[in-house]
């Protein structure tokens, strides 16, 4: 299976999960799970939300940010991977001057 994010439609989500600013995403949903390309512009964030049914795996490719998962703060930068396990609450904040870009995999279990 190949997912080509260049072929997917972009959606803009204002104040995602109560966060600041906007989030820009491209998503593919299939039998394996959800696969998402996400861009969080400077001064924007994804607000705190519960991972009710699956883990949330985020591979950072560009920019700087912070993930807060169950009150634990993690520094995000290119080459890092933030995992929020099922049952945990997390948020992602762009703390840099450039876009924070990452790919998320939410496996279907």
Region annotations inferred by a language model:
Residues 1-34, 47:
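A short, N-terminal "cap"/entry segment at the start of jelly-roll beta-barrel domains
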Residues 72-86:
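Short acidic-glycine-tyrosine-enriched beta hairpin
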Residues 86-109:
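Ligand-binding loop in jelly-roll beta-barrel domains
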Residues 31, 53, 97-98:
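Short strand-connecting beta-turns/loops that link adjacent beta-strands
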Residues 45-47, 66, 82, 86-92:
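Histidine-centered metal-chelating micro-motifs
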Residues 36-51:
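Conserved short histidine dyad/triad with adjacent acidic residue
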Residues 53-65:
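Glycine- and acidic-residue-biased ligand/ion/polar-headgroup-sensing regions
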